[in-house]
Amino acid sequence: MNRFLIAIDGPAGSGKSSVAKLVAQKMNMNYLDTGAMYRAVALYLHSKGLSAKDDLKKHLAEIDIEYIDGELYLNKKKVSDEIRSSEAGKLASDFATIPAVRERLTQIQRHICQNGKFVVEGRDIGTVVLPEADVKIFLTASFKERVRRRFEELKAKNMNLTMEDIADQIKIRDRQDSSRSIAPLKPAEDAIVIDTTSKDINEVADEICQIAFRRIKVEDNCC
């Protein structure tokens, strides 16, 4: 099997990144974080003095994104660390509403995944970017748990935000993601929904791996 795709979708704080990385590791597959791409592009456009109201097509055409040894590079510059700030998340939500931005990044993501085996995580992966994915997972968690996870993540990076700050940010992000006219956040019709509230990442990753192994077996038997 030369190509196999696992799409992992879900709202902020549902565990997408941690789970997707572990699934990729367990299954010896490549890992692709599409949310990181949006953050990188948003910071790049913002650094150019551009906003969501500007004509971005020329600047988007100049963008090249690569994953090298698990690190994200934009136009040959490593950006893996700076994209994890709260500012990057807010900017990403703003720019993600722009059709030209989504079109360009969807094009890049599809190109990266056209050959090989990938675990791809982010918003609208199973519905828009890779509707042909072999396995589609939509992760959920309670609002309280999502806030707690985000707080612990940022605290580990010495970012000084309160639980209230993070709760407000996630509320705004949820509202933007679910109400946007272009690719609103929702599970694909054939996605398997997993509530991660009371599960650790190993439990969730193992569950997804078992789903994937069953799918691989079915596809092998069909060939």
From Swiss-Prot:
The keyword ATP-binding applies. Its EC number is 2.7.4.25. The keyword Plastid does not apply. ATP binds at residues 10-18. CDD domains: CMPK. Its main location: cytoplasm. It is found in: Cytoplasm. GO terms for biological process: nucleobase-containing small molecule interconversion; pyrimidine nucleotide metabolic process. Belongs to the cytidylate kinase family. Type 1 subfamily. This is Cytidylate kinase. It comes from Pseudothermotoga lettingae (strain ATCC BAA-301 / DSM 14385 / NBRC 107922 / TMO) (Thermotoga lettingae).
